[in-house]
A protein has these predicted regions:
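Catalytic-core "active-site belt" of small-molecule-metabolizing enzymes
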Residues: 1-143, 157-182
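Glycine-rich beta-strand-to-loop/alpha-helix junction loops that act as flexible
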Residues: 146-156
Length: 182
């Protein structure tokens, strides 16, 4: 489940959520095949956490008990009229390899994370991700299941995937995404 809002935004009572199918997610170990259907795509980073407990209607104060790892995901989105398409028809959000999931990091003790995408860098405060608030809000509408991936926001780091190049991203010095674009 992906929340379509920038970092630091508070979850709303009617969230803009994108549900992604398992077949749309590829791992950092597989190459990224850019679809032929559109001329331009953008590769945008977002933090994500892995749910490891079953839950419904989770209060904010208990939400941290439901996730045990963090990573970066990369959304590969078509660009239409100069803007990435973050939601809408499944043709834009649910095609094969629409999401590249990075390697999981189980150390959740850091308060600040450094994110890099190629030469771009930024530091994010864990509190700005609003993970607990997002899980609490989503659990009112959806059951949280073991293995679910929740992305609370997107980051202002993006690049254009170019065929026959590599895209790398790291989280606090750990290389979590290193993929070949085909």
């Amino acid at each position: 489940m992906i929340i379509n809002s920038p970092i630091g935004s508070a979850p709303t009572s009617e969230p803009d959520v994108t549900i992604v199918t398992d077949s749309s997610i590829t791992t950092h170990k597989n190459p990224l095949f850019v679809p032929d259907a559109n001329a331009e795509y953008v590769f945008e980073l977002a933090p994500a956490v892995k749910i490891f407990r079953l839950g419904k209607s989770i209060p904010v104060k208990f939400a941290s008990r439901y996730y045990d790892a963090i990573t970066l995901i990369a959304r590969v989105m078509p660009v239409i009229d100069g803007k990435p398409v973050r939601n809408g028809s499944a043709i834009y959000t649910a095609y094969d390899s629409a999401i590249v999931r990075g390697e999981w990091i189980e150390d959740l003790t850091k308060q600040t994370l450094e994110v890099t995408l190629g030469e771009q860098k930024m530091e994010i405060n864990i509190a700005d991700l609003r993970i607990d608030e997002t899980i609490s809000m989503l659990s009112k509408y959806f059951s949280m299941k073991i293995g679910d991936i929740v992305s609370p926001c997107y980051l202002p780091l993006s690049t254009t995937p170019v065929i026959d190049t590599r895209i790398t991203a790291s989280l606090s010095g750990c290389n979590v995404i290193n993929i070949k674009v085909k």
